[in-house]
Amino acid sequence: MSSGGLFLLLGLLTLWEVLTPVSSKDRPKFCELPPDSGSCKGSFQAFYYHPVHRTCLEFIYGGCEGNDNNFKTIDECKRTCAA
């Protein structure tokens, strides 16, 4: 195969990887919930999974209540929801 053909194949495989959604059958349902700061007035850095962007993002957590889409570290969020 020529080098041009290899680059074309690599480009197509990369495009397929980007456009093909990750299977969400094993992802917990709470990963689909919106970020919820809760009712307390604290200001704590937290992370939530954003299902449209398929990544974990930062938000400010108040310190109580909220929902389960709330992680102390981005790594914990990625392990739970983005894997």
Swiss-Prot record:
It is found in: Secreted. Belongs to the venom Kunitz-type family. PROSITE patterns: BPTI_KUNITZ_1, BPTI_KUNITZ_2. It comes from Pseudechis australis. Negative results: does not inhibit voltage-gated potassium channels (Kv). GO terms for cellular component: extracellular region. Serine protease inhibitor. Pfam families: Kunitz_BPTI (PF00014). This is Kunitz-type serine protease inhibitor mulgin-2. InterPro entries: Kunitz_BPTI, Kunitz_BPTI_sf, Prtase_inh_Kunz-CS, TFPI/VKTCI-like. The keyword Hydrolase does not apply. SUPFAM superfamilies: BPTI-like.
